[in-house]
Every structure is written in structure tokens, then in C-alpha cells.
Amino acid sequence: FHTDFRFVPSENLHITLQFLGDVERAMVPRLLQEIEQSIAHISPFELCLGSASAFPASGRPRVLYIGTGEGSRRLAQLARSVRRALSAMGFKEDKPFKSHITLARRKRGAGSFGALDERNAWQEAFAGREKPGLCWQVSEVLLMESTLYPTGAVYTQLGRVALPGGQ
């Protein structure tokens, strides 16, 4: 089961508020300024892990993820604020925000499991392992660059905006 998926290295685990695509480096200061203004009304909050699941909702899963639990509404508010500001700059997001941390992606050309229901296998693998007490403080928004390589993505921090009252 696990050989058909490429797991995300722990240092790359993150929640994407909005994917921007290719961005000129000269735009980074303005992006950070717009993000800062858009989140000025949002204070730091606690976010907890939720349940494991997979995308898409039907058929063979391509992405294995863990959702968020307590604090998800505050995270959605943060995402809405950031997306609204970036949309005004011309960065349109065609997918609705789905709060999740990607754990693994199906490798290209990965085989089928035949009669095995992959989705149930994934959920059974994580049954009872959710950590509802695993929480952390959301105190900043990072602007990250993602460079894709055959071995996976490499992330570089381009900037950071603290939530008011955050570090």
C-alpha cells in the first residue's frame, strides 16, 4: 500500500491558505503588505488536528491528508481574509479552501490494489490514531515558494507576517 504513495517529509508539512502560482520576486513586498493588512483583525489561535482522509472523495485516492479539528473556523476566517486580499491583486483561487495537511501523494503510474478498497484501507490504517489533543498556536502566515523536483517539492520562505499579538 505505502509503496504507491510518496510521503511528504515532516519538514514540508503545512496548510496552504492560497496557491499563487508563478510570482515575480519584485511582488513579494506588496504581497506581504496586503497579507498583513488583511489579517490585522485576526489574533493568534489554537488549531488542532482532526481526522485522516483522502482526495478525491470518490474513486482511487490521489492525496492522503489529515484535516483540522478545533480552530478550523478561525483558520477558515484567516484563509478568507488572505484570499480576499490576494484576489484584489489578481490572484484568483478556483478551489474552495479545504483545511488539511497533505501527508502523501500517489506516485505517477502507481498500480491498482484490485479488490482492495483503498479508501477504507487508508482510514483503517489511521483508525484510533487521530490525536485530538495534538494542537498548536497559529501565530503567523508564511509566504512560501515551492519548487518542484522529481524527488518532491522544496520550500523556501519568502516572508512572514505575524498575527497581531503573535510572535
Where are these regions (language model features)?
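Histidine-dependent nucleotide/RNA phosphoesterase domain, centered on the 2H-phosphoesterase fold
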Residues: F1-Q167
